[in-house]
């Protein structure tokens, strides 16, 4: 290949490999042509929002004029192209800006793009979407002040404007509040993983909602404006492990109330009920015992368990290490839910041997 393309060969190989990686992450943005014509850098692809998440955000911005002030390679603009009245983009990096222009042209989209620093706004009445850099040299930044730009200066600069800021899912909600943010925090999950926490300024927030969980796999959303009258009782027939977006958004009680479930412990995210709500994955309780490895091994052996999905909350147990120690030799796939119940001197660890619903 080097004989044919010379010094360009490494760049061609890298572009080909990046396009293959991008197909699963961004393919939905361009269903007709795919991403086979797009340009990337490795870091830009890592930072790019997955297509389903970008499209979800675009639906919330339908009918608006939107300015993606950190447009990078054009992912959000591609998602907005059929929903926003107008979408414009800017970025401080001229290379990524050129890539965005190329990528959007591959979709037949003539985008309004310019080079600009996000801290120096170039639009007035548009909704501004901002994705501060959370990686540097492949390493993640976890503190809000370490974002580039930092979240505090961003919120100060756009105070009073309609703004959407993408953040890491593990952000400290209280710290965000101390920065003066008064809108909605939306936690988004996709394919079973929590992808991001998105800040929606007050003018864009749902009515009365400060926290929202959006589960893209099922299309379900729940907010803190819903009832949270979820009781605490011993396990019923089923145990439900709520989606990570629900847990991260602090909406376990609201989720339980919606689905007619209760908590096993007020500080633990597991829910339970005597019937499994439609479309939810659950674990049918077969046996319940005080956690003891030897006793657990005996119970699993008696149930012919050969593979165990192990879920743990509230106690320092490594599921993979425990699975190896159990030495299961049966033929039946089961699940073990291990959790702390109670607090202080009254707390105890309970194991539930279950049959997964799917």
Swiss-Prot record:
Pfam families with a match to the protein in the record: Thump_like
Biological process (GO), any one: methylation
Homology family: Belongs to the methyltransferase superfamily.
Organism: Mycobacterium tuberculosis (strain CDC 1551 / Oshkosh)
Keyword S-adenosyl-L-methionine annotated: yes
Parts of the chain that traverse the membrane: none
Molecular function per GO: methyltransferase activity
Keywords annotated in UniProt: Methyltransferase, S-adenosyl-L-methionine, Transferase
Name of the protein: Uncharacterized S-adenosylmethionine-dependent methyltransferase MT3122
EC number, as in UniProt: 2.1.1.-
């Amino acid at each position: 290949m080097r004989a044919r393309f010379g010094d360009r060969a490494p760049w061609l190989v890298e572009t080909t490999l990046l396009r293959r990686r991008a197909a699963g992450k961004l393919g939905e943005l361009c269903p007709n042509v795919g991403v086979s014509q797009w340009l990337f850098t490795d870091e830009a692809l890592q930072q790019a929002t997955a297509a389903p998440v970008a499209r979800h955000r675009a639906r919330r911005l339908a009918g608006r004029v939107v300015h993606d002030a950190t447009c990078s390679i054009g992912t959000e603009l591609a998602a907005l192209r059929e929903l926003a009245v107008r979408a414009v983009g800017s970025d401080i990096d001229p290379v990524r800006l050129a890539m965005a222009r190329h990528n959007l042209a591959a979709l037949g989209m003539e985008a309004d793009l310019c080079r600009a620093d996000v801290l120096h706004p170039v639009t007035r009445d548009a909704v501004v979407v901002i994705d501060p850099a959370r990686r540097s040299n492949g390493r993640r930044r976890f503190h809000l002040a370490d974002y580039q730009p930092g979240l505090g200066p961003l919120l100060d600069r756009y105070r009073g404007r309609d703004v959407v800021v993408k953040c890491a899912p593990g952000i400290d909600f209280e710290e965000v509040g101390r920065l003066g943010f008064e809108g909605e925090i939306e936690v988004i999950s996709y394919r079973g993983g929590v992808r991001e926490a998105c800040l929606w300024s007050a003018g864009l927030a749902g009515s009365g909602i400060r926290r929202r969980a959006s589960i893209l796999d099922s299309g379900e959303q729940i907010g803190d404006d819903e009832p949270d009258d979820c009781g605490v009782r011993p396990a019923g027939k089923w145990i439900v492990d709520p989606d990570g977006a629900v847990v991260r958004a602090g909406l376990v009680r609201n989720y339980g109330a919606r689905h007619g479930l209760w908590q096993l412990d007020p500080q633990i995210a597991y829910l339970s009920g005597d019937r499994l709500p439609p479309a939810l994955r659950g674990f049918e309780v077969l046996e319940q015992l005080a956690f003891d490895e030897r006793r657990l091994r005996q119970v699993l052996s008696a149930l012919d368990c050969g593979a165990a999905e192990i879920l743990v909350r509230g106690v320092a147990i490594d599921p993979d290490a425990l699975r190896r120690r159990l030495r299961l030799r049966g033929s039946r796939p089961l699940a073990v839910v291990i959790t702390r119940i109670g607090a202080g001197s009254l707390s105890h660890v309970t194991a539930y041997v279950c049959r997964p619903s799917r």
